[in-house]
UniProtKB/Swiss-Prot annotation:
Residues found modified as Phosphoserine: S141, S535, S542, S887, S891, S919, S923, S939, S967, S970
Name listed for the protein in its UniProt record: Protein KIBRA
Any GO molecular function: signaling adaptor activity
Region span, Disordered: 429-449, 509-547, 822-949
Notes concerning its domains: The C2-domain mediates homodimerization.
Ranges for region Interaction with PRKCZ: 945-988, 948-967
Organism name: Mus musculus (Mouse)
Tissue-specificity statement: Mammary epithelium.
Length: 1104
């Protein structure tokens, strides 16, 4: 029988409190009770008897405006905020204990990283002192510097100078890294201790927080948030004042420090300084700011709108992909595994420095002790590689894919911001982009990227606190980690599909039945389920990159070892960068025909030094012909010309030793971070260098002339000698693009014996004046010339008379003989590749020439400054009809979209309406389909194919928009289930946030004092340690945006859009997550305490 139909027992009375709450009076015992006496007949007595969401006798659910839902146990007269029906609190305790184990491992790994860095710093300081002493002793005698072997790097003045600068830079960099790592260690140590105390406190408290205790915790949290808001305002004021101070200093990146060199180093380079000019012969390559004529105004608007809508769709797709990846990730768990890989990398760097350290002035005991430490370190590294799990590699691949998606999202947001400003400035009469009714608007209700959806930069919210928007490693560390785990994955690289992340080592997740979150929390699993693929078309083991941009995954393809940081097409990148080669024409270049690794002739551009001496080793090498064809997927061997005899220049033994060894190198310049990347991929046909048995081979790379304060010399790890060696090592140099054009890349193949004596067998010198600024990666093969052969040629007697046509050496004779034929063949091949492989202008012009001409203008401006003669023979593709004097084909008349015939009834994304079918009775004209915009919804001039219902008395009569029915909202918005553990974590997190903010404010105040002192002393440039630190360079970049807001308006808008996109990804992740949102939120809260967010770096130590 229902309870309302049951009468109250005798002696009981129902009454109401002053706030309307019902209570019951027992007149017999003269007591009051909140429990209805009839409940003992209708309610279950224990939780075991409860069905569905019932509460047992004596329990009541109540609501507090501040705390939310809480529960009252009238039997014990206590309150609690945990739901007694859900064992979520117990699951939280288990998750916290498991995370403490992971955090302890990460902390111990980072402590070991700090110790290894300390050893590296000690070795670097010893090496710098020894090299500096050698330089001082040998500085006065140039003869003693070159009296030894010219192949020994320790006695080469240029290499020795680069060694000293590199050692100094390494010491300063290691000092800065140790200061930063020390602060990270302190943060993680405090966070670990905080989590440990929370675990102990919550384990002792059986009932958790009561209602009054929870209210007190929330009041304290709110007070700390107010203090954080005030601190953020103070921080912003300090940043503004620093921006004003920084504006008074000169921050030219192309200063003399980047171009620091001696006269000998400039003379030694066989590449001349490039001419700084713009080719304005036709006046069609000058990129303007969309200043089109009046007749192209409409076409320009349409083109920009199309690109704008396409970029918007790309951003939406990238956000969905990022949300899917984040929903499968464990926040904080990957950090410990990444730290272990970083530890392996640091040990490898230490091992490399132990191998290449100079043994001068070392006692025999010190050398033996160093050798023992090196062997012990080799064993540790081998054991660490053997224990690397497959699931770890898979998780790191997904993390690298996420970083790639974040980079694509940054590019897309910058493109949208630029297009938005261009559309606004193009015409004031076009439809406003900020209208909320437009489906493609920046401020639309769904997927908004506008600044209006952003919270204030000084407000404190838990979304900003726990979710770090797109935190990434720095570029150098990211490349090392990716190459490290990619190298470890080669041992078990499967031929078929790769298994999921946790398939082999983690229990699978049970599906949550029903839609209730309470039931989902009752069947919690400790690990999220991983998806096999994010797209039905994606293949994790595909040998070639996918065609769709939505599933681009270069790190999971066969080209991952060659392009760890790039996602564009390799063929397109190589072809585009090749178009920019060889434009100077100021140096006499010849073609050299040499047998390749497979016995096929190679084409090489080389310049022969006129003299013989120490500088003869600086031989410039260019890309071979076959390597370009191989990169494009088509291999065409160079035809051997009749009548050309190699015996005329070389004998049979020496012909294979000269120029036959090749090295594959990828070059890329990152314009955003001002960094130049060098990727040493592999070395082929090493036997041509006459290598001895049981020798280890490494490649030494030097950027000459060396900068005064940057690392400019690198060495790969030594490998056992073989005919083909695969290195896959990347090196990063911080340098400006104008300074890079003045540099030369010297590549040497060296061997090292047990006494740490380095001997160079062969090398090449590559000009960096042709590096693409657009960020395209160019991969090429370079031929290496043997130093032994060159020394032998130098020892031959030279003729005394002046050189003439009859008095040239054998190499020059061969070069002059083959130059004309090679040039002709190269011209034909380059023109065919240019027309067929990279540019597809004819197809685009056939569709819409007026739109395509303007669209290609923004994509070609990178390659218009220096164009090869082969590329100039191609037909003109961009034409300014008002200034160009060449005869060009007449362009079709620009027409409006409604008058242009279309081949298919598809509507562009810039149109809001559907396709309009022209009425047959309207006019006797052609009865074909056309596209138009309607100004009225009830227009009788044409008929909608799917006419929407007419709304009478509508305010907007231009078009009828059906508003979505507003969903019926509950009186209280649905809250996440919160426990005492959640409240405690929130309280400690706000305390940590406030403490970190206080430290950042103190660092900014100290930095302000340094700049004020430097300004008072009359200094014109910023301090050197401030310009060299990567983190402070980012801070200076942010200060530049604060000062020149008009100049960096698009960048600021892009930053706002990225923050909005991060919040959208966070929101979408909660929708796509297969687990309850409470689980993901709790993991973020735990990870916050062990993942430092240092936006303002600590001041570094004093440099050398």
């Amino acid at each position: 029988m229902p309870r309302p139909e049951l009468p109250l027992p005798e002696g009981w009375e129902e009454a109401r409190d002053f706030d309307g709450k019902v209570y019951y009076i027992d007149h017999r015992n003269r007591t009051t009770s909140w429990i209805d006496p009839r409940d003992r007949y209708t309610k279950p007595l224990t939780f075991a008897d409860c069905i569905s969401d019932e509460l047992p006798l004596g329990w009541e659910e109540a609501y507090d405006p501040q705390v939310g839902d809480y529960f009252i146990d009238h039997n014990t007269k206590t309150t609690q905020i945990e739901d007694p029906r859900v064992q979520w609190r117990r699951e939280q305790e288990h998750m916290l204990k498991d995370y403490l184990v992971v955090a302890q491992e990460a902390l111990s790994a980072q402590k070991e990283i700090y110790q290894v860095k300390q050893q590296r710093l000690e070795l670097a300081q010893q090496e710098y002192q020894q090299l500096h002493a050698v330089w001082e002793h040998k500085l006065g005698s140039q003869v003693s510097l070159v009296s030894g072997s010219s192949s020994s790097s320790k006695y080469d003045p240029e290499i020795l100078k680069a060694e000293i600068a590199t050692a100094k830079s390494r010491v300063n960099k290691l000092k800065r890294e140790m200061v930063h790592l020390q602060h990270e260690l302190q943060f993680k140590e405090r966070g670990f201790q905080t989590l440990k105390k929370i675990d102990e406190r919550m384990s002792d408290a059986q009932g958790g927080y009561k209602l009054d205790e929870a209210q007190a915790v929330l009041r304290e949290t709110k007070a700390i948030k107010k203090a954080i808001t005030c601190g953020e305002k103070e921080k912003q004021d300090l940043i503004k004042s620093l921006a004003m101070l920084k504006d008074g200093f000169r921050t030219d990146r192309g200063s003399h420090s980047d171009l620091w060199s001696s006269s000998s180093s400039l003379e030694s380079s066989s590449f001349p300084m490039p001419k700084q000019f713009l080719d304005v012969s036709s006046q069609t390559d000058i990129s303007g700011s969309f200043s089109t004529s009046s007749n192209n105004q409409l076409a320009e608007k349409v083109r920009l709108r199309l690109r704008y809508e396409e970029a918007k769709r790309r951003i939406a797709n990238l956000k969905i992909q990022l949300a899917k990846l984040d929903s499968e990730a464990w926040p904080g768990v990957l950090d410990s595994e990444r730290d272990r890989l970083i530890l392996i990398n640091e040990k490898e760097e230490l091992l490399k420095e132990m191998r290449f350290i100079s043994p001068r002035k070392w006692t025999q005991g010190e050398v033996e002790q160093l050798e023992m430490a090196r062997r012990r370190l080799e064993k540790d590294l081998q054991a660490a590689r053997d224990t690397q799990s497959k699931a770890l590699t898979e998780r790191l691949k997904l993390n690298s894919k996420r970083n790639q998606l974040v980079r694509e999202l940054e590019e897309a947001t910058r493109q949208v911001a630029t297009l938005h400003s261009q559309l606004k400035s193009l015409s004031s009469s076009m439809q406003s982009l900020s209208s909320g009714s437009s489906p493609g608007s920046l401020t639309s209700s769904r997927g908004s990227l506008a600044a209006s959806s952003l919270d204030s930069s000084t407000s404190a919210s838990f979304t900003d606190l726990y979710y770090d928007p797109f935190e990434q490693l720095d570029s150098e560390l990211q490349s090392k980690v990716e190459l490290l785990f990619l190298e470890g994955a080669t041992g078990f690289r499967p031929s078929g599909c790769i298994t999921t992340i946790h398939e082999d080592e983690v229990a699978k997740t049970q599906k949550a039945e029903g839609g209730s979150r309470l039931q989902a929390l009752r069947s919690l699993s400790g690990t999220p389920r991983s998806m096999t693929s994010l797209s039905p078309r994606s293949s994790l083991s595909s040998p070639s990159p996918p065609c769709s941009p939505l599933i681009t995954d270069p790190l999971l393809t066969g080209d991952a070892f060659l392009a760890p940081l790039e996602f564009e097409d390799t063929e397109l990148s190589t072809t585009l960068c090749e178009l920019n080669l060889g434009g100077s024409g100021t140096q006499e270049r010849y073609r050299l025909e040499e047998p390749g690794p497979e016995g096929k002739p190679l084409g090489q551009a080389a310049s022969v030094a006129p003299g013989c001496g120490l500088k003869v080793a600086c031989v410039s090498a260019a890309v071979s012909d076959e390597s370009v064809a191989g990169d494009s997927g088509v291999y065409e061997a160079s035809a051997q010309r009749p009548g050309t005899s190699e015996a005329a220049a070389f004998d049979s033994d020496e012909s294979e030793a000269v120029g036959a060894t090749r090295v594959q190198i990828a070059l890329k310049y990152d314009e955003k971070n001002k960094q130049f990347a060098i990727l040493i991929i592999q070395l082929s046909h090493l036997s041509a260098l006459s290598l001895q048995q049981d020798q280890k081979v490494n490649i030494r790379v030097a950027i000459l002339p060396c900068s005064e304060s940057s690392t400019c010399l690198f060495r790969t790890r030594p490998l056992d000698s073989a005919n083909t060696l695969v290195f896959n090592e990347a090196f990063w140099v911080s340098i400006s693009y104008p300074a890079l054009h003045q540099k030369t890349l010297r590549v040497d193949v060296c061997t090292t014996d047990r006494s740490h004596t380095e001997e160079c067998l062969g090398g090449a010198q590559i000009s960096l004046a042709e590096v693409c600024r657009s960020g395209e990666r160019s991969t090429r093969w370079y031929n290496l010339l043997s130093y032994k052969y060159l020394k032998k040629q130098c020892r031959e007697p030279q003729p005394t008379e002046a050189p003439g046509p009859d008095h040239v050496d054998a190499v020059s004779a061969l070069l002059e003989q083959t130059a004309v034929e090679l040039e002709k063949r190269q011209e034909g091949r380059s023109s065919s590749q240019t027309l067929e492989g990279s540019w597809t202008y004819e197809e685009e012009a056939s569709e819409n020439e007026a739109v395509a001409e303007e669209e290609e203008e923004g994509e070609e401006d990178v390659f218009t400054e220096k164009v090869s003669p082969e590329a100039e023979e191609c037909p003109a593709l961009k034409v300014d009809r008002e200034t160009n004097t060449d005869s060009v084909a007449p362009s079709p008349t620009v027409v409006r979209p409604k008058d242009r015939r279309v081949g298919a009834p598809s509507t562009g994304p810039f149109l809001r309406g559907n396709t309009i079918i022209r009425s047959k009775t309207f006019s006797p004209g052609p009865q074909s389909q056309y596209v138009c915009r309607l100004n009225r919804s009830d227009s009788d001039s044409s008929t909608l194919s799917k006419k929407p219902p007419f709304v009478r008395n509508s305010l907007e009569r231009r078009s009828v928009r059906m508003k979505r029915p507003s969903s019926v909202k509950s009186l209280r918005t649905e809250r996440l289930i919160r426990t005492s553990l959640d409240l405690e974590l929130d309280l400690q997190a706000t305390r940590t946030w406030h403490s970190q903010l206080t430290q950042e404010i103190s660092v900014l105040k100290e930095l302000k004092e340094h700049l004020e002192q430097a300004k008072n002393h009359g200094e014109k440039e910023l301090p050197q340690w401030l310009r060299e630190d990567e983190r402070f360079r980012l801070l200076l970049r942010m200060l530049e945006k604060k000062v020149d807001r008009g100049e960096h308006k698009s960048e600021l808008q892009a930053d706002k859009m990225m923050r909005a996109a991060a919040k959208d990804v966070h929101r979408l992740r909660g929708q796509s997550c297969k687990e309850p949102p409470e689980v993901q939120s709790f993991r973020e809260k735990m990870a916050f305490f062990t993942r430092p967010r240092m936006n303002i770096p600590a001041l570094s130590a004093d440099d050398v």
